[in-house]
Amino acid sequence: MTAAFPLTLSGVHVRKQGKTVLGPVDLTLATDGTTIIVGPNGSGKTTLLRVMHGIERVNDGQVAWECDDPAKHGFVFQTPIMMRRTVAENLAYPLKLLKTPKEQIAMAVDHWLARIGLEASRNGQATRLSGGERQKLAIARALIRKPDVLFLDEPCANLDGHATREIEALLYEVASAGTRLVMATHDMGQARRLANDLVFLLDGKIHELGPAAIFDRPATGALAAFLRGDIVT
């Protein structure tokens, strides 16, 4: 991770109920590509994503964005869509919050429905979508605002192999088009397929970070043990 991205974490700590769940964390993201955050359950992956996005307060340290415009940051949660609304309404919602003109909203919704293959479902309830379709909708809804960086928390959790491959293809396409991706996953195969850079968290601390090559040449015993499966995920 060499070229600077306009997001730097310095001495960040997050404590909950008197317990440190994240920190100390010092991290500057690379300027482009996809950063994958890995680590066992409870290691702080989701908390780190939330801190980066600005929806988790830190107890100590600084989170410095070069650009503080929230429209430039997108987030896909593990339960991200509004189930009682239609597919089209889900897509339109972020743009309505930004008071985007109706004509532009309609064009953007049409574009993303076509891109994720859900044109026929535009007026159907989100509850009728499959798990993979819901996740594609969630990603499209985050991207419809054209963010510079997109944070994703386990975007393929509980999906079958076919749906996972579809989501990975969409994410690869999005990253190739210039959107910066920062993603937490427990799927090491997925991490290998998508990562340009890797962050390994353990007990709320970054134990190793670097280019994807560290998958094959880990510098720490902790990452080597995690990759072997000796640390339960």
Predicted feature descriptions by range:
Residues E103-S121:
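Conserved ABC ATPase "signature" region
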Residues G161-A163:
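Helix N-cap at the start of a conserved alpha-helix in ABC-type nucleotide-binding domains
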Residues L150-D153:
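Catalytic Walker B motif of ABC-type/P-loop ATPase nucleotide-binding domains
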Residues T185-H186:
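H-loop/switch region of ABC-family ATPase nucleotide-binding domains
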Residues H53:
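Helix-to-loop junction immediately C-terminal to a conserved catalytic motif
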Residues Q125-L129, E133:
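Conserved ABC ATPase signature
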